């Protein structure tokens, strides 16, 4: 009976700490991760908007010359290495300009140090951005075999709200971002576990103390009860 009471008290004290700890870990694995990915998306979107503004500030329409170069007025987008490289150096993100569905300028390099050009966007990107006119965030864009978080933004012809001539893409290395996210999540989980262990230990100690006090109280009551019973018995005998 005494052991059962002790176990019940410990369980009542420890259970809330365990539930709170588990709930905190679940939140860290879901809500916190989603929030961090949302921050990545917002950062990519902001950089894409800045890159698009840098191209759009040039007067004139987007057009392709006979030699295949793409221009915005008098600005040669196909030769805009300095612009995309400068954005990458400041933001840490790769920038790509698509004319139609084809990459014509990018800061992204392959393993040989060459720019990743002339490749085409995937069907889903074409349908969503080029045909649908929607911005698109992806958690897994492959650039020469390397996965990136990526953001696509449609590019409209000058003065038009319906003619889409291409896309701006901004990407950041997925493995590095995931490593940073996982580091934050593990720090939260470890902190929660440490606090949970301390709470459990404190709860056990308090529970043991309460159980001991209850046993002592019960013992005193039983002693008093026996004394009273004995007194009544003696009085009855006399």
Predicted feature residues:
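Extracytoplasmic/periplasmic sensor domains and loops in membrane signaling proteins
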Residues: 78-92, 107-143
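Glycine-rich acetyl-CoA-binding "A-motif" of GNAT/NAT acetyltransferases
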Residues: 164
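Juxtamembrane membrane-water interface segments immediately C-terminal to a transmembrane helix
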Residues: 29-53
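Helix-start (N-cap) segments at beta->loop->alpha junctions
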Residues: 145, 156-159, 169-181, 185-186
